[in-house]
Amino acid sequence: MEAAARGNKKLQERVPIRRTAWRLADLAILFLLLALLLHRVLHDSGAPWRRAALACEAWFTFMWLLNVNAKWSPVRFDTFPENLAERIDELPAVDMFVTTADPVLEPPLVTVNTVLSLLALDYPAAGEKLACYVSDDGCSPLTCYALREAARFARTWVPFCRRHGVAVRAPFRYFSSTPEFGPADGKFLEDWTFMKSEYEKLVHRIEDADEPSLLRHGGGEFAEFLDVERGNHPTIIKVLWDNNRSRTGDGFPRLIYVSREKSPNLHHHYKAGAMNALTRVSALMTNAPFMLNLDCDMFVNNPRVVLHAMCLLLGFDDEISCAFVQTPQKFYGALKDDPFGNQLEVSLMKVGRGIAGLQGIFYCGTGCFHRRKVIYGMRTGREGTTGYSSNKELHSKFGSSNNFKESARDVIYGNLSTEPIVDISSCVDVAKEVAACNYEIGTCWGQEVGWVYGSLTEDVLTGQRIHAAGWRSTLMEIEPPAFMGCAPNGGPACLTQLKRWASGFLEILISRNNPILTTTFKSLQFRQCLAYLHSYVWPVRAPFELCYALLGPYCLLSNQSFLPKTSEDGFYIALALFIAYNTYMFMEFIECGQSARACWNNHRMQRITSASAWLLAFLTVILKTLGFSETVFEVTRKDKSTSDGDSNTDEPEPGRFTFDESTVFIPVTALAMLSVIAIAVGAWRVVLVTTEGLPGGPGISEFISCGWLVLCFMPLLRGLVGSGRYGIPWSIKMKACLLVAIFLLFCKRN
């Protein structure tokens, strides 16, 4: 039993959310889908396009069942950090991980602001109980230099935040606006002005730094970066701030820079490999029982976030109920009406809370607090600690480092020392050993231990492994939000991110980690399995949605119909389904405080994403499975400004769709062009029917189908006539035209 749960005052409460009306709506739409399928079967004409429609609609029905399961029983968790007051001395240590991979796509100032917000957290004895580790997979001296400068700045920034109760402790965000000063705020005004000046100096030092100069004039501090290549270098670990008692007492958390060893002969497993290296390095330096991981662009927005997390990690009667605490991804400076459909507000409130009511929310890769022993692969139940007693068993799981095996045994059996390490610099040499690129060979790292390898979405796969071991997880929603980041803007960044996620999901779906197999042979609950499938089938939706989208143009071009005509009873089923589904989606957005425009933007982006990012992800993974290609981890550019008053005239107009020469735009551009051509040809046929009395094939349903696609693909159609970054490149246009020509030829021959 957790120590905190034995107290008189509760730390958390699980609150079910009633949704009776929504359940009725779920069932009503399911009934209409089944009725449409029944109509198809009873009125089967044998036409291939109608049977294709039946197959697609059967898939949509299956997708709706998964959606209903995910939303059926939502919950929220309320936390009461004020009740931790009587247990201050019992609060455990936390190791905080920040990952960055590319100093160009993820500028050092972005990472610096995230780190500074972590160093300024409100937590008892933060200097002793918190430690911040930064993984730099780019092995950049610029990143290391920026973090060293950040540590110096933190000596004044952290006391300023605590003295004045600063709410948002990422300097770029805090200084983006000027607070209102009163007559009695003289001291605060003086401090604020000084800190703003110091931050501007920090920004200039980091932005003016260049790699050759650092290597030449760094006084030997950056000698380890000489002659290194990004994918071929030894381990570099630097203790940038060691807050031991002999020097400063209770100041701010330790700060450690880590760039793990890489070799071109060994796979480094992207972010999952970096997280596993950080886990081992931190185990030998501070070995906190809990870990927080953040992407480099997700800064702390609520300085009490660790206290809230402890309410969940310590507040249940047993540990099984909370293996990890996931916070929702929130975005600052979000564009009005969510033009790119990537703010995920409704998905969180509807699907996220629903999954939280099952075995628990998914691990989303950032903003998550973990139990270290769960990451080490510990199972639930009586057999949880078996396999950790002998040195041979520990070696097969964790590797050859005796120091690490001893630290792992301490975590698993709860034998952690309450005395802080006096000098973590003395641990650097042994820490380098476990960050070596060949350390994991012959061990369980990446499989049963640590972050799981084998998918571009290593985070979700790792969470599934934890759930499969019998653990549960919790969703932590607090005000103000725990962490904030910046959502990708423009077309390329959004679609690149979605393609990466979809590729990772499909890799899991067709692998031995498939949740159906995990439910059959392990402890993943059935409804949790369906919840995972709800996400994993994202890319599988693409061929079905593409097929259904092509049926409208095909029928208009070949004078056929695939939807019931107005004279058929099935027309009213299809019409009722169309109205019910769109009304359902609209009401979801309204209930979540979103606008009608936001609802339309999200629906539009789903159609664009399905015909672009998801489709390309589907094809990429299929080709990889057949041995024709490899999936590649693509880092999403971080677009946020990190200096006060920064204005970049090269940035695109907010909310406007931008394009590049990525192949992701080819199929969706072709589909947009095809829909317009089909409507034009269909309208011409209507004129012939009216004037010459020719028999007509397609009905109004096919026109509505194509017209709806035209509305959804309007950003692409505008891109066809746009210029610069707002115009679709000619190479994409020509390839799209070729696809359209092939489809027109197909329609003519059929």
UniProtKB/Swiss-Prot annotation:
Keywords: Cell wall biogenesis/degradation, Glycosyltransferase, Golgi apparatus, Membrane, Transferase, Transmembrane, Transmembrane helix. One of its GO terms (molecular function) is cellulose synthase (UDP-forming) activity. The keyword Transferase applies. Its main location: Golgi. The chain crosses the membrane at residues 27-47, 52-72, 537-557, 570-590, 608-628, 664-684, 697-717, 727-747. The active site is at residues 137, 459. One of its GO terms (biological process) is cell wall organization. Its EC number is 2.4.1.-. It is a multi-pass membrane protein. InterPro entries: Cellulose_synth, Nucleotide-diphossugar_trans. It is found in: Golgi apparatus membrane. GO terms for cellular component: Golgi membrane; plasma membrane. Belongs to the glycosyltransferase 2 family. Plant cellulose synthase-like H subfamily. Thought to be a Golgi-localized beta-glycan synthase that polymerize the backbones of noncellulosic polysaccharides (hemicelluloses) of plant cell wall. This is Cellulose synthase-like protein H1. It comes from Oryza sativa subsp. japonica.
